[in-house]
């Protein structure tokens, strides 16, 4: 099973107890004007251009996509949306396990709306739970009742 992730933020202290790694899922059914993560609203992969950061170096030649995002020296082009399978995502985040164990932290699933990808989110949460890692779910609550029960 695969899911689309907007980003992973390590060493978070505002998304739950202890030191946490927050996984931002791509996609949200709502379009709130006060959204803190508007890059995660779309269910599609997307490039973003931050003009204020651009130093006009010409490396991108004005092309803003997944290929040029990694080459921008000042991160004026950022690509949001990477496909992960459950094991790859869990393995990447388990690098932070010593921080979780020593601080009482864990993993926070956020977004977008993490439960808009219900099968993937549940499998990821179960994988961490099976490893004894605390999992918090940051949700807007705009989801089916049966998903909440899982």
Residue ranges of model-derived segments:
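N-terminal pre-triad scaffold of radical SAM enzymes
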Residues: 5-59
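Conserved Radical SAM active-site core
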Residues: 42-149
């Amino acid at each position: 099973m695969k899911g689309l992730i907007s980003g992973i933020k390590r060493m978070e202290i505002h998304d739950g107890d202890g030191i946490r790694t927050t996984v931002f899922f791509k996609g949200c059914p709502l379009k709130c004007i006060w959204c803190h993560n508007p890059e995660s609203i779309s269910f599609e992969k997307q490039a973003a251009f931050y003009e204020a950061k651009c130093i006009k170096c010409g490396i991108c030649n004005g092309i803003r996509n997944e290929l040029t995002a990694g080459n921008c020296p000042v991160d004026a082009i950022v690509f949001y949306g990477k496909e992960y399978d459950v094991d790859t995502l869990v393995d990447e985040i388990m690098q932070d396990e010593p921080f979780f164990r020593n601080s009482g932290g864990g993993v926070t699933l956020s977004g977008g709306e993490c439960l808009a990808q219900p099968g993937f989110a549940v499998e990821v949460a179960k994988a961490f739970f099976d490893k004894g890692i605390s999992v918090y779910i940051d949700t807007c609550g705009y989801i089916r009742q049966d998903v909440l029960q899982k």
